[in-house]
Amino acid sequence: MSNIVILGDIHLADTSEYKRATSEAFLDWFASWEQNTNDNYLILTGDLVDICLLTGRVTDYLERFIASSRFKELHICVGNHDKKKILGIDQLAYEFYARKTNVHYYSEISEISINGKSVLMLPYYLGTNDQGLTMTEYYSQLYKDPHYSQYHDLVVGHFCDDEFSFSGASDTVLNVDKLQEKNGKVCLGHIHTRNINPGLFIGSTWACKKNENDPNRAAWVMDESGCWHEEKLPVFCEYLEVSYPDPLPESKAMVPIYTVLNCASEQIARSQYGDIYIRKTVAGENEHRSKQDTSISVDSVKGFDILEYFDTFWETSDVKDNKEAYTLCRQALEKRA
């Protein structure tokens, strides 16, 4: 018996110790996963990486992932994090996978056959296609296209349904319900949580942010008869809060990740909790406290390290990928530290 197995967005990353640890935990699990056999076929919904411009470590993650795969074929629906235009040139993080004869990635709409099942791949794209249409314009009308409106056993996409997104957003596709009516199964990546529509969105393989905790993540599995079931995934990571110096809350995750409240620096947190994975430290008792609330404990002030605090701030900022800005700001702080 051969199965078609689907995994949601993976987001391999090394921009923090906890992201490295989660990536490592996933790779270790994947290598021994019982579905990872040469009888089965794997589909990935995209976003294998968190950032398209790769470090050496993430390149290593991608190579280890493909080296440990025993699947007969691996099919990837390209996501928005996988492909970027850098210096005017399209860059795909795992373009070197093209050298593998049993690995296929799809950067444009594609009809393929996997284990005798008809599959329509709808990858994410920015700008316009060769018809001058945006992703929203093109995919939203597929249900009435003479060619693509034909029945498929499976449709895999990397975008958001208009029912659960902002009006006019570039990652939004309309009429997904009509695609569902015309096809056997629609599976969407891109959205990391499943609670909005667990029958449509597979969700990411693990929580990439603190508001994405979910102990019920799953792979989707279709057997040769076309029947579907879910296979629960391990909890690769979990985001938790602890108020310094209280005991750490329990977690069954492979990588528990802590926000330490009432603590001004990672150095102080580690003096209490040792070698844990820290998302950030917060000087007050609430990460979202009001600007007027500036109270912190006396213990939290001791040993305050401005450079360490800056690094923590930068990791959680919207500009954390701007290496040049980080270097300039940190050098200025080093002169004053």
Region annotations inferred by a language model:
Residues 1-65, 71, 138-152, 337:
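N-terminal active-site segment of His-dependent metallophosphoesterases
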Residues 5, 118-120, 238:
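Conserved beta-strand elements of the Class I
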Residues 6-8, 42-47, 73-81, 85, ...:
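Active-site neighborhood of phospho(di)ester-bond hydrolases with catalytic His/Asp-centered motifs
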Residues 15-18, 46-66, 83-100, 167-173, ...:
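Metal-dependent catalytic neighborhoods of phosphoester/phosphodiester hydrolases
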Residues 36, 223-337:
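Accessory, non-catalytic peripheral segments of nucleic-acid enzymes
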Residues 66-71, 147-149, 176-182, 251-252:
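Short, conserved loop/helix-junction motifs that constitute active-site signature segments
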Residues 75, 82-177:
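Conserved catalytic scaffold of divalent metal-dependent phosphoesterases
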Residues 162, 167-231:
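Conserved beta-sheet core of the metallophosphoesterase superfamily
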